[in-house]
């Protein structure tokens, strides 16, 4: 059986991930006109720029959908977002600012839940709006086939017939109007935006040029913290975790994690927290650039890692960061539910997150400018009295440290001998100032 269909399967049921925008609206109508039987599936991911989800399936039926369903994915999305925080599953960072993999998390949830809904309806062909140059085409491919082994893939944007007839947004708009729908193109922005409850991605068009900065972006989850005319008063916020799970913000508990994440977004968003500019490597190894928002994820991540550093030992923290980066890359590649990812997730959640209980108080200012005001946990291994500089009882004495210095550093003689050995072989040059060999000046290399 062919997995990827290059042309429209006339007379067959096709499920399309339907956003209600021009692209998917025109594609659905075109498929119906050409003799396919389209079904529309819309994921409610709590997009901050979507105000009427119920209207989307109605529009799909107007455009010819045989059936249209709205799938509430918010609970599962937040659950996966919290799991990513517990595991530190983030591998793209620039200057200490993190991309929280919010789009890959959204694709993991959308790709599995929509295809599961299609399977319930006897729909085994899936189409979506991803292009062949991006990451999503592979993410959806993997998650779709993982959920339904009999799935076939049909993407109008890979069909030469569709491209020849409706290759651009202007052609799509004219097609909709010609079919009796008064569909006006929205005003073109200088970039494209994709969002869910966890975060927003701004990319493409003007943002493909590195001399276009965050200043051309209108945040949809935060504020223009770079604009000095925007008043942003400082704000204290307390975040509480129990066994790795965020349970309270400013002492307030929530009926469910969705409400908690919405409140975290509101708090962080008031300051522009979690906004970053990243150059990243796509799955196909080409570099792309995105500007990201994730105010709630950033707030929870900061508090979580503060507790982490106060509770766990150095080796555990090192493994958390190493495995978290590895897991983040798997998530980015559409492998969040693969066995190698599940192994890392289980280890990090079981042995790291389970001990993260406590409260962190922060002062948020502008953008990613914040201070940690207090850290409280019964699980802290940080003990001020162990290293106090004041007189009093101590867990060890000066004599103890003398012994430690002697035993811990017996290799100094070995290291000195190696340095002189490197000098004799020409890897290092002699230094008259210190008496020890030193790394040769690269400018003199080969002279």
Curated annotation (Swiss-Prot):
Its EC number is 6.3.4.5. It catalyses: L-citrulline + L-aspartate + ATP = 2-(N(omega)-L-arginino)succinate + AMP + diphosphate + H(+). The keyword Flavoprotein does not apply. GO terms for biological process: argininosuccinate metabolic process; L-arginine biosynthetic process; urea cycle. InterPro entries: Arg_succ_synth_type2_subfam, Arginosuc_syn_C, Arginosuc_syn_N, Arginosuc_synth, Arginosuc_synth_CS, Arginosuc_synth_type_1_subfam, AS_cat/multimer_dom_body, AS_multimer_C_tail. L-aspartate binds at residues 131, 135-136. It is found in: Cytoplasm. One of its GO terms (cellular component) is cytoplasm. L-citrulline binds at residues 99, 135, 139, 192, 201, 203, 280. It comes from the Bacteria. Keywords: Amino-acid biosynthesis, Arginine biosynthesis, ATP-binding, Cytoplasm, Ligase, Nucleotide-binding. ATP binds at residues 17-25, 43, 129, 131, 136, 194. Pathway: Amino-acid biosynthesis; L-arginine biosynthesis; L-arginine from L-ornithine and carbamoyl phosphate: step 2/3. It is an enzyme of class 6 (ligase). The keyword Membrane does not apply. Gene3D superfamilies: 1.10.287.400, Argininosuccinate synthetase, chain A, domain 2 (3.90.1260.10), HUPs (3.40.50.620). GO terms for molecular function: argininosuccinate synthase activity; ATP binding; protein homodimerization activity. PANTHER family: ARGININOSUCCINATE SYNTHASE. Belongs to the argininosuccinate synthase family. Type 2 subfamily. Homotetramer. This is Argininosuccinate synthase. It comes from Klebsiella pneumoniae subsp. pneumoniae (strain ATCC 700721 / MGH 78578).
